[in-house]
Amino acid sequence: MTIQKNWQELIRPNKLQVSPGSDATRFATLVAEPLERGFGQTLGNALRRVLLSSLQGAAVQSVQIDGVLHEFSSIAGVREDVTDIVLNIKDISLKMQGEGPKRMVVKKQGPGVVTAGDIQTVGDIVVLNPDLQICTLDEGAEIRMEFTVNTGKGYVAAERNRPEDAPIGLIPVDSLYSPVRKVSYKVENTREGQILDYDKLTMTVETNGALTPDDAVAFAARILQDQLNVFVNFEEPRKEVTQEIIPDLAFNPAFLKKVDELELSVRSANCLKNDNIVYIGDLVQKSEAEMLRTPNFGRKSLNEIKEVLAQMGLHLGMEVPGWPPENIDELAKRFEDHY
């Protein structure tokens, strides 16, 4: 059906490349390539908006401090006033498995610093930034605070967290539910075969640790997928199952596999891409000397490639009769499940 060509023949990435940062639970860079021209901006902007606004998380909704009637008070022996304490409470990062609202309490005597790690939580609430300072107590000072924790999405201002029947002394807190703290993306040109006119989308994601960055992106993509389904007003025709005739090849079908599927280091992969080596068939015909003449390609990259090829029963310097075939892209798709 011709209409199917609208989406079936568009180029799309084989997989998402995830490079964890110093803390894999909080930082990562994700790369998707190749994408059709313009899709980098389209997908990057949409994912960024959903990541920052629509993912579920947990946060403090309100706090009650013993002896305090409102947020414009001060507490004897506590160096910070209540307004500053509330601002610090807003920065507490939480992970909660079940539904809210739930309570957690902190009680401490001075002298010393009250941190988020001092909070007594119930079983399914985890404080993700225990070193966060909430307030400082002088000698003889004491403080007790009770927090209300709930789940939600995005940002909710303190005014919306004040219930109509709020008791005296309940102080609402701005709630930042989103587990995603920062998202940035950039779009660059990339190559697919001989064509340079494709997009490469690179996203840098930072979370509070409640979700890993790649899980956060996965949930954001699922939200977009679900929202876009309403615009699809047709049923996809079922594919007729036919017995495909696999042609005989003069070479190993594994040569039709692309080198970017070999999970090489970034340096080695970039060297191959810059030398226009797309398929394994292109690679195995090269000699070691030819590879070492490739710009920025050193002995370490050579050994890495030799090891990967050896695991496939291949090596550099092979003779490949009939390579490259005229219909190489078509053959690569047909043999995708056979090598």
UniProtKB/Swiss-Prot annotation:
One of its GO terms (molecular function) is DNA binding. Residues 251-339 are annotated as: Alpha C-terminal domain (alpha-CTD). It comes from the Bacteria. Residues 1-235 are annotated as: Alpha N-terminal domain (alpha-NTD). The keyword Transcription applies. Keywords: DNA-directed RNA polymerase, Nucleotidyltransferase, Transcription, Transferase. Its EC number is 2.7.7.6. The keyword Transferase applies. GO terms for cellular component: cytoplasm; DNA-directed RNA polymerase complex. Belongs to the RNA polymerase alpha chain family. This is DNA-directed RNA polymerase subunit alpha. It comes from Rhodopseudomonas palustris (strain BisB5).
